[in-house]
Amino acid sequence: MMLSTEGREGFVVKVRGLPWSCSADEVMRFFSDCKIQNGTSGIRFIYTREGRPSGEAFVELESEDEVKLALKKDRETMGHRYVEVFKSNSVEMDWVLKHTGPNSPDTANDGFVRLRGLPFGCSKEEIVQFFSGLEIVPNGMTLPVDFQGRSTGEAFVQFASQEIAEKALKKHKERIGHRYIEIFKSSRAEVRTHYDPPRKLMAMQRPGPYDRPGAGRGYNSIGRGAGFERMRRGAYGGGYGGYDDYGGYNDGYGFGSDRFGRDQNYCFSGMSDHRYGDGGSSFQSTTGHCVHMRGLPYRATENDIYNFFSPLNPMRVHIEIGPDGRVTGEADVEFATHEDAVAAMAKDKANMQHRYVELFLNSTAGTSGGAYDHSYVELFLNSTAGASGGAYGSQMMGGMGISNQSSYGGPASQQLSGGYGGGYGGQSSMSGYDQVLQENSSDYQSNLA
């Protein structure tokens, strides 16, 4: 006897936009008019690689009529959020549940963990001592750095077996020095994404006062400062052959070539906007939905920030560290959806300990992982009305592609014509950026003469 298509695919709907703290009982109440197969066992939540709720779930129903009833709940609200309901099937459900969450094949059986919250200047020896008694494979430790060669506060460690990695996870929230360390399951694929630097962002880096533009070959004309040179020489802290095991990144970053990053999207939370610190943040969002915080107490921890946004559940928190190794009082917080980022803005001007905290939205509806194109970047940096220090304000910036013109906001005689691309919306208050460009422009023009 042949099963019908519906019988083979089941009666499944996918739900998106659930509150982070949502339980199976709450989903049952949301679908109270529908008959869910096996009760709460028919509700399958989707989790991130770190084991956090993704805000999505599959719901198995008893018949096609129940599916139709469930679809009528689309765009109804649960708490303060509206919930989307889509028709799905058991094939999609099985595949997604198998390939997501902390126990997916992408994260299992390779022995990787990711550490977050390391003290500034933490060495590999300190990490080895932290995991004393647990065998780490040779060259199995990676300490990523940002574009200025500074530690990001994260590390990847590969243990000799998955069983040892599981033991390492039990040290979650233990301390190195005065900092408690968060430990998450990771994978070789995640390590690769940290090894492949955001090349488009390199092209956007502010030139130093002694950097000189190249011969006007698109991205190749961007000055390469000392921080970039440190990273180009393998300043990721060793391990895995200095990129070579992951595709030979030591051969160069593809300046002026087609290798110039067409595969990754990033949400910029820094740039030269001095409201975001000096010259940009090392934070790179994978969702494109971020909120920037300013005015944090200097003793604030990542856990304090998670609690600040409760009941929302941020995916990631990045506390900025200044060149002197001290916290700047600013942080970037990544959310899974634009709706969550907008909801988080309700906390603007709320107090954390003895200080009120300012929030700046860096998210647009319908984006995921930034707003990249092969040839241009559009950044939407929205600030609250009257906020000071915003070089870009709420202007839209477009450009930075391969172009023969630039529009950094000065007179035409002061603008570069060698391939910077341009497109800062006519802003001229770029925290010294114009002056540097003018100096570089005069050097560049004298070389051509």
UniProtKB/Swiss-Prot annotation:
The modification Dimethylated arginine is found at residue 233. Keywords: Acetylation, Isopeptide bond, Methylation, Nucleus, Phosphoprotein, Repeat, Ribonucleoprotein, RNA-binding, Ubl conjugation. Disulfide bonds: none annotated. Sequence repeats lie at residues 234-249, 354-372, 374-392, 418-433. Residues 11-90, 111-188, 289-364 form the RRM domain. It comes from the Eukaryota. Residues 354-392 are annotated as: 2 X 19 AA perfect repeats. The modification Omega-N-methylarginine is found at residue 233. The modification Phosphotyrosine is found at residue 246. GO terms for cellular component: nucleoplasm; ribonucleoprotein complex. One of its GO terms (biological process) is regulation of RNA splicing. There is a cross-link at residues 35, 87, 98 (Glycyl lysine isopeptide (Lys-Gly) (interchain with G-Cter in SUMO2)). It is found in: Nucleus, Nucleoplasm. The modification N-acetylmethionine is found at residues 1-2. Residues 234-433 are annotated as: 2 X 16 AA Gly-rich approximate repeats. Its main location: nucleus. The modification Phosphoserine is found at residues 23, 54, 63, 90, 310. GO terms for molecular function: RNA binding. Component of a ribonucleoprotein complex containing mRNAs and RNA-binding proteins including DDX5, HNRNPH2 and SRSF1 as well as splicing regulator ARVCF. Interacts with TXNL4/DIM1. This protein is a component of the heterogeneous nuclear ribonucleoprotein (hnRNP) complexes which provide the substrate for the processing events that pre-mRNAs undergo before becoming functional, translatable mRNAs in the cytoplasm. Binds poly(RG). This is Heterogeneous nuclear ribonucleoprotein H2. It comes from Bos taurus.
